[in-house]
From Swiss-Prot:
This is Transcriptional regulator NovE. The keyword Repeat does not apply. The keyword 4Fe-4S does not apply. Coiled coil: none annotated. Transcription regulator that specifically regulates expression of genes involved in the novobiocin biosynthesis pathway. Probably acts as a positive regulator of transcription. Does not bind DNA. Keywords: Antibiotic biosynthesis, Transcription, Transcription regulation. GO terms for biological process: antibiotic biosynthetic process. It comes from Streptomyces niveus.
Length: 217
């Protein structure tokens, strides 16, 4: 378990994301004081509810700034998850203090902690977002690695990863259905009796047959 505020990637260094300004430590968010850093020789000031960007900031510097902000946002979710897991393991008072400190709701915190538990730091891919990992968190470790490796290699977005997983699961379900398909030879009278019974139960004929068979075993 880590409590240092780092993420790690599989086979790619420590995955740490720098979050302190170029000069000195970051100012605590709740202090109300700005935290300054420099891009393209120009000072950018981050406050709790505002980012002050100089008008003459170059496009290149603006892109670097945005990349850093997005990286910190994604990393901070991992940090919250690791912080919650540490608190759960160390103190047992699960979410009460966390909700008070972060002002996040119970379900959000539980999701962060759940994903952090599912992925030890060494299994996290620093080229993918927290949301990528959340998409596969319910799968087995082998399946998680399988899909995350594909996402890294093919540069899938979170939505594309979700689409591919759903398509795969849908294909598996279709295969299973094909394996259990039955062909029944019925006379018209019997078929009509079954249809009438299905209508009386507000079921399709297939669902009615399944319910009868399930009730007999």
């Amino acid at each position: 378990m880590v409590a240092s505020g780092r993420t790690a990637s599989k086979g790619r260094g420590n995955g740490a994301t720098p979050v302190r300004p170029t000069a000195g430590d970051a100012t605590p968010v709740d202090s109300g004081q700005p935290s300054d850093t420099t891009y393209g020789g120009l000072e950018v000031s981050a406050e709790r509810t505002r980012l002050r960007i100089p008008r003459d900031l170059s496009l290149e510097a603006w892109c670097r700034l945005g990349g850093r902000i997005l990286a910190v946002c994604d990393s901070s979710v991992w940090w919250i998850g690791d912080w919650l897991v540490f608190g759960q393991n160390q103190y047992g008072d699960r979410y009460r203090r966390a909700m008070k400190e972060t002002k996040l709701d119970y379900q959000t915190l539980r999701n962060y902690a759940w994903v952090a538990r599912k992925f030890e730091p060494s299994r996290r891919r620093d080229s993918l977002t927290f949301q990528h990992h959340m998409e596969v968190a319910a799968l087995s470790e082998a399946e998680q690695d399988h899909w995350l490796d594909f996402a890294v290699r093919l540069n899938w977005s979170r939505n594309e990863l979700r689409k591919q997983i759903r398509a795969s699961l849908s294909g598996e379900e279709d295969d299973l259905r094909c394996e259990v398909q039955l062909n029944l030879q019925l006379d018209e009278l019997r078929l009509e009796r079954w249809r009438e019974a299905a209508r009386g139960s507000n079921l399709t004929l297939t669902d009615w047959i399944l319910s009868v068979v399930d009730g007999a075993v």
